[in-house]
Amino acid sequence: MSALMIARIIVKDPDKLQEYLTKTQAVAAPFGAELVHRGKVDRALTGESADHELAVIVKFPSLAKLDEWYGSDAYQPLKTIRDAGADMRITSYEV
């Protein structure tokens, strides 16, 4: 089964966030990652408001590949850039 990674993002530093997104895409590609969606939140359909500004959805061939990428030596240095650029809530789903 494939897996989705969904990141809900509140931007702190747009330049750092862009650096993170660019580098992460390159690092995730060897693990079979495919960008499904990246964009601004339009509106909340339920509740008072969305608790984030942006959303990113990435598809992986499996949860194992997603976990392999997230734990990879290549990804670890990007976490510092991620945390400087944004507050993120990242979740995974098997589909």
Regions found by a protein language model. Give the residues of each.
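Short S/T/G/P-rich N-terminal loop/turn motif that feeds into the first structured element of a domain
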Residues: 1-73, 92-95
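Short, conserved catalytic or adaptor-binding loops enriched in Gly and charged residues
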Residues: 26-27, 81-83
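Short, compact, well-ordered microdomains
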Residues: 73-80
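C-terminal end-helix/capping segment
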Residues: 83-95
